[in-house]
């Protein structure tokens, strides 16, 4: 074989290497959903491409076999051919033949390696990653033909690899396992956010959906003490007065005590009927015909399961009970939805204070019922979560704490701003530089002057 034929063959081998490398990366990178869409649009080449990516492991093996064969061919033919072409160039230098041969060998080896890596591997890989769809449609036919021609060898090689793995007690890994753990998905989302593929709102919503499955109803409930309810012991006029004042759509109806919830009443139905009643009918009106069933579940039910139950039964309110059968609080579909999209306010919530208000770096005013995990996420802290809320944590540290007093946990000073009886309504939390001892201390401080809170909020419930 003369030098010209050798150079042509080297060019063919480099081109084949580039083909197999591009094939390997393209069929891994291409989105199956996009190929399926092309099939529905009538693209015939997409049918063959779908067949290739369905048996991805087999075609990856074919690509790897092709890369190996062409690389070996380049090693066998490329270096000697380039060495023969380069050797005469060093003869005029008067170098000993052994030195001239060694130098020409080194240059030839470096040149063939450069062409193989750059032209045969790196460039095709870059193109395949950026143009995966177009390349997959282009190479699917030739790659399938190569696979069919060398199927016996590919089958033997795959079988031998499985046997070798089995000897060491290992299972062969699937090269196209498309599943990802939750942590991997979170990392992918984070990278997509950094690269501008998704916006911060999308990132926030998807992360909240991951957290959603870890929530229990107790963590998002309206506590028993804050439940607004009407009682059958009230007169109809008293009930209507309470309903008009608070403006809720659905109300729990009790039998005189919040531990005895009879059901719920929807004010839309109630007030719609009131509009068309005579004065005499209004005087005789009672709440009982308007009481509808309400969901009653244990407070530890997962929020996801509760949502499914509410959807199935088409009831938008659930009463939660503790392990002793007493009412611990209630949850509405709005409370559940707010776990994903953040706080939802309607035209009647104008005066409602956000749960968390930012005053500065590491300095917040927040409601006492904000969850510990929210505080940790907000501050980048690691406060122990053996209680549910920041208010509960403060009472655990100092059961006799009063408004105006503070405790110090690690590098954070937490001051109680408002209390309702023994319920902590609002606190001020601030990171203090230079205190990272982790020791909890208690201090009596004067009540702060009223402060104007800025509009930077983290509206979560």
UniProtKB/Swiss-Prot annotation:
Pfam families per the UniProt record, alphabetical: CBS (PF00571), CNNM (PF01595), CorC_HlyC (PF03471)
UniProt KW Cell membrane keyword: yes
PROSITE patterns per record: CBS, CNNM
Gene: yhdT
Family membership noted in the UniProt record: Belongs to the UPF0053 family.
UniProt KW keywords: CBS domain, Cell membrane, Membrane, Repeat, Transmembrane, Transmembrane helix
Membrane topology label: Multi-pass membrane protein
Cellular component per GO, a single term: plasma membrane
Subcellular localization(s) per the UniProt record: Cell membrane
Ranges where the CBS domain occurs: 221-280, 290-347
GO MF: flavin adenine dinucleotide binding
Protein name: UPF0053 protein YhdT
